[in-house]
Amino acid sequence: VTSVSQALQGVMPGLNIDMNDKGGRLDYNPTMNIRGTGNLNTGSSASPLVLIDGAEGDINSLNPQDIANISVLKDAAASAIYGSRAPFGVILVTTKSGEAGKATIQYSNNFRWSRPTNIPDMLDSYRFAKYFNAAQKNSGSGTTFIFTDDTIDRIQKYMAGEYPYTSDPNGSQGNNFFPFNVASNDNQNWPRNFIDKTSFGQEHNLSISGGGEKVKYYLSGAFLSQDGQMNYSDESKKRYNISGKVTGQVTKWLSLDFNARFIRSDIEMPTFVKLYGDRFFAETTKLYPMMPLYDNNGHYTRNPKLMQLTSGGRSNSSKDTYFTSGGFHLTPLKGLGIHGQATLRTESYRHQYNVNKVYLYTRDNQPVEEAWLGGDPDLAAGKTFVQSQTQQTSMMTTSLYADYEYSWNKHNFKVTAGMNTEYYYINELIGKRYDVINENVPSINTATGTSDLKGSSKEWATMGYFARLNYDYEGRYLLEGNIRRDGTSRFRGNQRWGTFPSVSIGWNIAREAFWSPAEAYVNLLKLRFSYGSLGNQNTDNYYPTYSIQNITVGSVDAGGRWLLDLANKSNIASSPGLVSSLLTWERVTSYNAGLDFGAFNNRLNGYVEYYIRDTKDMVGPAEEITPLVGASAPKMNNTSLRTKGWELQLTWQDRIGKVGYHASFNLSDAQTEVTEYPNPDKTFYTKDGDGNTIENYWKGKKLGEIWGFKTVGIAKTDEEMQSWIAQHDQSKLPNVGNNIWKAGDIMYANLDDNPAIEKGTSATDPKDLTIIGNYTPRFRFGFSLGADYKGFDINLMFQGVAKRDVWVGGDDRTAYSKGMIFWGINGGQWDSTGYEEHMDYFRPEGDEMGANLNAYYPRPIIGSKQNQQVQSRYLQNAAYIRLKNIQIGYTLPKAWIQKANLEKVRLFFSGDNLWTGTKMSKNFDPELIYQNGMSYPLSYTLSCGINITL
């Protein structure tokens, strides 16, 4: 693994780590949440707070070898002391410190080789052509086929080694190009052509620690390098870490500590991946296998995607993070402690990418400028530009608190009170200039065209006061109460401050006298209950209660023109949207009940926990207002969620003679329901600010619901299909093309009184739609096994999801290409493909490819989605179990290494993502269901290394 979050996946219940729509790209990390969805992404964030040695930081930028401990606070009562930044939990990371004694030097390395976990194979060119021709015939086009008999004959001869050319050397297609798709005859596997490389990575770590009774120190440095998996172009990620920590006991009553870290991260990749990484497979999969890699002159065939990848430009980004922290600890009186800490974190981010001209070559070796994907005018044929971005951020935090401990008889008290402040500032500048004169040295200064420049500066601050009381009686009865008073710069006046209480109680039953007979078997049995409330000020707008008027430089492209001619206006001002001055804190309240237990002298340990979390007054959309107002409705505190869930963790550790072994298992589940949302009609979809159709919410909706049709089956004969549609009119379904229904088509269930099969627009009038599944991951689990014997050790880690439904076939809201990897033929000819799985499609008796009456897929149809409605038959079971890691190590006997003055030497071999069990379509990785399987793939990895201590 190359990040801490990857290593944490499946380790503890309730800490959910998922791959996002970026997949395995080098410039992204997995997403994290604690106990499921916290909000609806309608205006605020529900990410957990990550504290590294008491200060917020990026867990994925840390050197894993510097980490001493990671703990997770999940409920509001446990997180109360951390206030307004922690309503959705806290991840506490403690880095290593020095210990008194002689200096200890440690060195470790890791060399790894990675390949993609799942790249589906395309059909060979012959079957691909037959598959597409069958789909064209099914559309009702008669005898007009996509691939001619002559082309298919050349394909067969080429595959048999009887034809030497990948396309007809005398043929021509388009504007005097060699044949490049439907008229060519190569046999390529394009997904593997683009991304199927064994990539190399390495990691090196060096640390020294030690000290005396007064001063202790820890210093470390690390280097990580990881290459990408893409062919034809290089990708790389490099990270450099330097850290130091010093603690000093100045007097008996005063100690000081200082902590500093520097992190440098460099990422390089093709501009093509930076711009189109989210649709990478959507574009590469559209290439036909008969399309040659090279034309007869040795150039890349007319393939803009390949040219953009290899020569379209480069993206380079770097990020420098500086972190410093200083603290003191006073103990002026017995039981009294006074603690203070101040931290400063600054980040400097730089990113530059350039777009070069892309050329294709004719039969006569003449270059022709080609446009990039997407129709962006900035990426038109012949356009070049360079864009440079700089971003400076700084965060300053302070905390000061005192605690006092006092015991009287068997009563123990602890009182804590203090305050903390945070200040965050970000400044960003983006410059763009066209017409680069030297593509080998792209920069703003080596471009001569027009320039675009924009920038921004933003800031926010928080302040909080807190108090905590802890009480326990003989370790049997426990009580804790917290109160916080938090303020934020994001809200106005009376809405700026909020008060948030929490309380927890516990009963250690194993400490009771009546439990003594069972203590030899169960030595820990503790019940605990908690209630807590925290505020969330993490809105996606730093100034959510202020109207902002956009003023931009006018241009014809932006619509900034005068009425009577095309002259540019000097600038354009747009009216600001409405805002609510009453916008205030989201309130996150949790209820928690748990049981901790330990048995058999703590060989068996575990806990079980049940929780409810209410997220109230979330920032959401206001109800629609009349268009006469001339502005969008303001966001308000008008939505709420309730999450219910439970967690279980079990661990066992023991030794039998010289064999030590351990096992752990964790399981968790959570479901979230919308309890308040301004959508009384319960419409399925709405529009976002950019006009895109997105999922809508309503009161009573469970997050993750998948609405679709119930599938009756595939008609085996024309008579069966005609009999069905005579009673159940399916012509009103969206995107049915020529509305031709035959054997091999889907029969949809009629769920209402209307004889027509129709798609409703709301949960109040769904027509024939019903809930067919839920994409929320259910029953997340992880379990590990390990053993050691005479220096040998082995550890295995499994992780997975026991229940999850996903729909990866697209729908009528999305472009045809969204369902291409699942369906193959997916509407239009140029938004379709053919993989091995797609050959399991319905074919009647007498079909030249052989009959297949019990096929999985319906008959394919070019230009129609009639068989590809969201439906129960093709809902995918995305449950999976994955061997996340296996590691085998051997620690050399001390007798072998003492002469070299070595304390410990361990060799290891490791593998990541080596096996996956799932019932999902083989075209998909069950962890990458976003973008309908079109994300950058994950990788499986083999690695080896050594750990040395001296």
What are the residue ranges of the model-derived segments?
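Short, small/polar-rich motifs associated with maturation and membrane association
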Residues: 1-243, 255-257, 323-324, 359, ...
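Extracytoplasmic gating/loop element in the C-terminal half of outer-membrane beta-barrel translocons
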Residues: 360-363, 372, 801-906
